[in-house]
Design a protein with these regions (language model features):
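Active-site "cap" helix and flanking loop/linker of ATP-utilizing ligase/carboxylase catalytic domains
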Residues: 176-197, 203, 212-270
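Internal nucleotide-binding/catalytic subdomain
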Residues: 123-206, 213
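Short, flexible turn/loop "capping" segments at secondary-structure junctions
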Residues: 42-43, 157-158, 301-306
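Glycine-/Pro-rich loop/turn segments that contact NAD(P) or position catalytic residues
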Residues: 104-121
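Short amphipathic alpha-helical segments and helix-helix/interface helices
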Residues: 17-22, 113, 275-276
Length: 343
């Protein structure tokens, strides 16, 4: 096997996770570290190490034994639950990657806030309006590859309703946002990696709310690639293996994704997607993410697991993407029978 990268966990949802796996696998052989690889992941793998990434100690031992027989080039994960484990294993193998200390502090909101405050980083609680800096760091050079603007749903859950990436987003030139991102990276001591830095736009300027020290979810890497040409997944793989990432923009467009949540809490009785959605100009994809018969929770209290569908669009501007998303939404129909009336 030719110098693979180890991926801790394939992810739980093909609809969200397969894109990133395909991009990593296009650049380097991938060995999945997971108890059992999902069927959708198998075509993209060069190998499988049977170990539960959630069992940190046992997984580390299994990886060390594997690395004694194969030259492992890097360790990656796209799963929040395995970020600390991936950092620990990379450190044990002497490979590039997020430090254990950084991974641990990003997983603890109180510790992260204290660290950032001590590093003169302006912080705030999560909330609208929200923007995330898709940041690539290499040896002191901090590059914001793209900005993701997120429309949040109703409280208290405030789940994302839509993400939008625009190659010409005016905030890319906002010096206060760039300063907040730079200070965040320095406070965390990150010298190499891909970060998803969440910020809240306030009257006092951008305020950092959270930091994800790995690739973002929700198909944001897809949006970034469609809008700018920058491949965040391959950049993350390059950084994890000690190589130079290519973050040169090759596109000047916009891309957006929208999620449908149940209108009521109850049993999903009907869910249908017309194939005409794929024929809408600007449509990238539209996928059902729920099954009839399942119990679902309405938007204000929903989780990502309650989403009914996702659909993505590409256009010259965010407004063009919005128009396409609206047209695509007409091809989705759903009926939820509230629990109070369900038979």
């Amino acid at each position: 096997m030719s110098q693979p990268v180890l991926l801790l966990g394939a992810g739980r949802r093909c609809e969200y996770d397969e894109f990133v796996l395909t991009r990593i696998a296009a650049a380097r052989p991938v060995v999945l570290v997971d108890a059992a690889p999902p069927d959708w992941a198998r075509p993209h793998l060069d190998g499988h190490l049977a170990a539960d990434p959630g069992k940190d100690g046992a997984t580390a031992s299994a990886v060390v034994r594997f690395a004694a027989r194969h030259r492992v080039r890097g360790v990656l994960t796209c799963s929040g639950e395995y970020t600390v484990a991936a950092a620990r294993i990379a450190g044990q193998l002497g490979l590039p990657g997020t430090s254990l200390a950084t991974a641990a502090v990003c997983a603890d909101p109180a510790a992260l806030r204290a660290l950032l405050t001590g590093g003169t980083v302006p912080v705030d609680d999560p909330g609208p309006p929200r923007v995330c800096a898709e940041t690539v760091v290499l040896d002191g050079e901090i590059r914001i590859a793209a900005l993701t603007r997120t429309t949040l749903g109703p409280a208290p859950a405030r789940q994302p309703l839509r993400h939008t990436v625009h190659a010409h987003d005016g905030l890319l030139h906002n010096r206060f946002l760039r300063l907040a991102v730079d200070r965040t990276v320095h406070a965390l001591g990150v010298t190499r990696g891909v970060l998803h830095i969440g910020l809240r736009l306030t009257d006092r300027g951008p305020r950092v709310t959270d930091v994800t020290p790995r690739l973002p979810g929700d198909l944001i890497p897809l949006l970034v690639r469609r809008a700018t040409g920058v491949d965040l997944a391959q950049a993350a793989a390059a950084l994890a293996t000690g190589e130079l990432p290519d973050t040169t923009p090759t596109r000047q467009r916009a891309a957006a994704i929208q999620f449908a949540y149940p209108a009521a809490t109850g049993r999903l009785e009907h869910l249908d997607l017309s194939p005409d959605a794929a024929r809408e100009p600007g449509a990238d994809r539209m996928i059902l993410t729920q099954h009839t018969g399942n119990q679902v929770t309405a938007g204000p209290h929903a989780t990502t697991a309650d989403r009914l569908a996702l659909w993505a669009a590409v256009g010259d501007t965010p407004a063009a993407c919005d128009d396409t998303l609206r047209r695509m939404a007409r091809h989705l129909s759903a009926t939820v029978v509230p629990f109070a009336t369900a038979a």
